[in-house]
A protein has these predicted regions:
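A short, glycine- and basic residue-enriched loop/turn
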Residues: 20-23, 57-58, 63, 105, ...
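Phosphate-coordinating loops and pocket residues in cytosolic domains that bind phosphorylated ligands
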Residues: 25-28, 62, 71, 161, ...
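Hydrophobic alpha-helical membrane-association signature
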Residues: 30-34, 80-83, 113
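Short, conserved glycine- and acidic-residue-centered signature motifs
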Residues: 27-30, 80, 107, 140
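Hydrophobic/aromatic residues within transmembrane alpha-helices
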Residues: 15, 52, 65, 113-114, ...
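Crotonase-fold acyl-CoA enzyme core
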Residues: 90-170
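Conserved CoA-thioester-binding segment of acyl-CoA-metabolizing enzymes
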Residues: 1-53, 75, 89
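Glycine- (often His-adjacent) and acidic-residue-rich active-site loop
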Residues: 54-89, 106, 136
Length: 173
């Protein structure tokens, strides 16, 4: 697994998306590796807590790898969307506590991935949002439902309809 790194110490496993040159954007391989990693960690009795983050200071994850997305067929795009739903469901449903350590951008699928964790902690430079709504594309990995559960219906509508976009952490509270 080259796109994901893990380090476990004293029951805490840090899982890093390791594509800093792409702002930790996710393609099908990254999504599969995260799913596989979380399934392995679920079975590991030495792991008590999982922290998910992105390599580097610029991004937790910029979401879908747009370069990758521009080159795939509609059928592959549909498979990728379903895999994204599996990814967020896997993270959300793991029995161990999960923490998203959001550094830099958490956009689109990256935002949805962070919302799948039990707790989200953000650095001062974090920018969180779902900019796809500005071009009429709804979040495809269950993000709208998770957002409502996290911030409430009224705030979720405000965030999605007005698209605070790459909101600072203070703005998205």
């Amino acid at each position: 697994m080259t796109n994901i790194t893990t380090k476990t110490d004293d029951g805490i496993c840090i899982v890093k998306i390791n594509r800093p040159e792409k702002l930790n954007a996710m393609n099908i391989d990254v999504a599969k590796e995260i799913i596989s990693t979380f399934k392995q960690l679920e079975k590991d009795d030495n792991v008590k807590v999982i922290i998910l983050t992105g390599e580097g200071e610029k991004a937790f994850s910029a979401g879908a790898d747009i370069e990758y997305m521009s080159k795939i067929s509609p059928e592959e795009s549909e498979r990728y969307a379903k895999l994204g739903q599996e990814l967020t469901a896997t993270v959300e449903n793991i029995t161990k506590p999960t923490i998203a350590a959001v550094n830099g951008f958490a956009l689109g699928g990256g935002c949805e991935l962070a919302m799948s964790c039990d707790i989200r902690l953000a650095s001062d430079n974090a920018k969180i949002g779902q900019p796809e709504v500005t071009i009429g594309i709804p979040p495809g990995w269950g993000g709208t439902q998770r957002l409502m559960r996290i911030v409430g219906i009224a705030k979720a509508k405000e965030l999605v309809f007005t698209e605070i976009g790459r909101a600072s952490c203070r703005e998205s509270r």
